[in-house]
Amino acid sequence: MAGHSKWANIKRQKARVDAKKGAVFARLSRAIIVAARHGIPDPEGNFQLRSAIEKAKAAGIPNDNIERAIAKGAGKLGADSELEEIRYEGYGLGGVAILIEAMTDNRNRTAADLRAAFNKHGGNLGETGCVGWMFNQVGIVTIAAPADEEAFLEVLLEAGADTYELIETEEGTIAEIVTEVTNLEHLATVLKAQHYPVREAESRWVAINMVEISDPEQGRRLLKLMDALEDLDDVQSVTANFAIGDNLLTEMLV
């Protein structure tokens, strides 16, 4: 029986992983469709599309899927549901501000799904503009940590970057470089020309001020809310203005 139970657990875990992977593929494919629809369906002349394709390839999406998404966006595969980009805003437990970017072909469905997730985890979906002023949109380029930081700084100055941060990840140290959204393509182009392989180039919302969470129960519920929102099919990204310190995070995981 123990073996059977373990096999059942493994199957459930694999199903969760497969579902998560499928959701990521769908999310990235939608981004390609919208990028191709908004501009020309040629990545060489469409930076948004080029960035979406690079992100999709990094996630392991097959080339056939990518080409099909581009063709859909260009209208070459017949009638397709019109996807639109919508920004939603709301509050988590304790008044934490949350900003959600979605792509949907049904606003009513998306709003209902978001409202249900907020309500389940102690938050509420707000009106447009209720928390948007608490965030700025910036351009962010991600690369592997540079070996020569002094030379790297010179390149950043030339490219018009604002700031950068070194971040430890499971795959090693990366550098996240922040710039104005309007300068994102130029920054990515300069970095590539100077032989810094760009892992990701995207616009992102960042909180102007962060709220430090001190209550472990509030922290747990906020993280559950973020997970629930990110798991929704129509959601592309979720940004919040709270931070959890390492000590509290350790306490929460015990």
From Swiss-Prot:
Main location: cytoplasm
Protein's recorded name: Probable transcriptional regulatory protein Cyan7425_4347
GO biological process terms, semicolon-separated: regulation of DNA-templated transcription
Family: Belongs to the TACO1 family.
Annotated GO CC locations: cytosol
Keywords: Cytoplasm, DNA-binding, Transcription, Transcription regulation
One Pfam short name: Transcrip_reg
InterPro entries: Integrase-like_N, TACO1_YebC-like_2nd/3rd_dom, TACO1_YebC_N, Transcrip_reg_TACO1-like, Transcrip_reg_TACO1-like_dom3, YebC-like
Organism: Cyanothece sp. (strain PCC 7425 / ATCC 29141)
Domain of life: Bacteria
